[in-house]
Amino acid sequence: MTGLYHLKPDSAYTVSVRDGEKEEGSISLRTEAEYVTLNVRQFGAKGDGVQDDTHFIQAAIMACPKNSRVLIPEGTYKITSLFLKSGLRLELAKGAELRADTDSSHFPIFPAAIQSYDEKAEYHLGTWEGNPLPMFSGIICGVGVKDVVIYGEGVINGNASKENWWNNPKVMRTAFRPRLFFLCGCRYVSLQGLTFMNSPSWTLHPFFSDDLRFIGVTVKNPADSPNTDGLDPESCKNVEILGVRFSLGDDCIAVKSGKIYMGKKYKTPCENLNIRQCLMENGHGAVTVGSEMAGGVIHLNVEDCLFRHTDRGLR
């Protein structure tokens, strides 16, 4: 999977595919118009790997107007949790790295479930292995947002190791470990081209979210890292996973829909998942259904994928 970057806004391009001198095909396209680009350096981010750049990047995100883009240029940006907003376009340029802090006391906590005033409903945020449980907020978080595109040639590094998040990984210390990328109740979210690595726990975890696209993304975690699944859609609908490269220490893709409590209460399956042209290596399972699947799974398609050195292909 090859991405195209550094294109000008509102400009026409023709992309051709050639076999030597012979043109096999072409497609014409026009990039979206753009009002302004907000460079996070203009908001105070240094990208020196020392200053905590969380608030400066978050300010750029919140200030970004419609039909505009937040740009994170080359540099190493120390962060805790960044929160997405609807309509956001966020680009991580080549050489840009978001590197997570590893001090859990610096992270917000997502409570497990908050009771509604009429006591007839629950608002779920924190989740751990299919149950409503408190967790630290993800490095990149989206809650109730829609129409978001995050793309580029940059890296999102959870910075996890056995000295921090991977130490006694099954023990809840105030809250459970954060995800590297977490969505809750979101729609129309796309990730394109980015590299995700060294996740504290599950790497990409969309939860009760629909109409998602993961295209040309790379997920890399050490082979001995605990519970660092690559992509775990949980009770999600209409998910496209195309050209993603996985190399990690657990399941590459684990399709989920909650344990008994969540499955019985919400009866929300994972539905309409299309997995194509992905490379999955060094994991326990390439594509697995469960565990945590009390809500069921409907219409899962896997085609043209390569499984290399995984313990199991399909489970």
Predicted regions and their residues:
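Extracellular/periplasmic carbohydrate-active domains that bind, remodel
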Residues: M1-R315
